[in-house]
């Protein structure tokens, strides 16, 4: 990404760069083990009193994103109350999937968060699974036979007419108050 490239090549002088999954970054910022981080939009919403959004930078999609997918053994309209697995690497995508399944497909599945692999995308006993990142891209470009694939950004756009904001950059309000010059970009 242009932002991470810029940070790695000089824009982050004097800063420590941590590479981690979105869920790990969310947890570290919530625990105040990070001062500034990319954070899921749902985590920001849950902790808005403690975090400050950094303007002009986000992870969003105005259509297909290909890296946030529901992979299912059955059409989404047939998921109902069946079991759906959630990637342990995400937070916003969990909330997004739950909203889409409930509102667009009248489904209220049993959810279980766990590690998932594209080699066995929908394990026995599950109707579907939520994938993000490289694993989702692999499944998008090489879909297994007999599997339905739903791009959640496209589903959101069709349902709401709005783009989906998956993540934003945020700073702990205490850090922002103590170091305002360091947040100028």
Show where each model-derived region lies.
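N-terminal hydrophobic or amphipathic helices and topogenic motifs
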Residues: 1-60, 80, 141-145, 155, ...
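Bilobed "Venus flytrap"/periplasmic-binding protein-like clamshell domains
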Residues: 1-9, 19-20, 66-126, 134
């Amino acid at each position: 990404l242009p932002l991470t490239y810029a940070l790695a090549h000089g824009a982050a002088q004097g800063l420590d760069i941590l590479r981690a999954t979105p869920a790990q970054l969310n947890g570290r910022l919530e625990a105040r083990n990070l001062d500034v981080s990319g954070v899921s939009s749902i985590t920001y919403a849950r902790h808005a009193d403690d975090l400050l959004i950094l303007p002009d930078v986000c992870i969003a999609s105005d259509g297909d994103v290909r890296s946030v997918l529901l992979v299912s053994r059955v059409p989404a309209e047939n998921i109902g109350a069946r079991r759906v697995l959630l990637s342990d690497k995400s937070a916003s995508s969990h909330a997004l999937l739950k909203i889409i399944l409930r509102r667009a497909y009248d489904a209220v599945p049993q959810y279980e968060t766990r590690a998932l692999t594209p080699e066995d995308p929908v394990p026995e006993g599950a109707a579907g699974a939520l994938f993000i990142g490289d694993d989702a891209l692999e499944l998008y470009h090489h879909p297994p036979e007999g599997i339905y694939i739903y791009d959640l950004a496209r589903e959101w756009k069709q349902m709401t007419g709005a783009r989906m904001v998956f993540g934003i950059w945020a700073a702990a309000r205490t850090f922002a108050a103590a170091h305002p010059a360091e947040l100028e970009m």
